[in-house]
């Protein structure tokens, strides 16, 4: 019983750290159903991929230290470690929680990139049609017709 209580306390603390690290801007996009991906590039630009619209520069910038805090918070939450000398990257599944449903996470740190960067891929609540891919420019009309 005491171990379960301790585990819940540790889990909740890790969620609090992640929520604080992500900040209000990213949490806002994580709660939007039409946003399927949130990413921070090495230049610090925060981009989103919106269903049916495509990629948008949000105009928000994250400094490298904050980006790194997000990466390490997700490593901790997902039970992963990052060895900068061996592989300065992280691939993780973010478990479902009170913050948001489960997501996929990919991050790169200096050694692979100039500054920390990451992508959070949410599970889409919508189903993409082939026509959606053509509209977004991910597929040509000729490719659509061939399929």
Positions of PLM-derived features:
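P-loop NTP-binding catalytic core
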Residues: 49, 55-146
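N-terminal anchoring/assembly modules that precede and organize ATP-driven motor systems
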Residues: 1-57
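Generic hydrophobic alpha-helical segments
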Residues: 26, 146-147
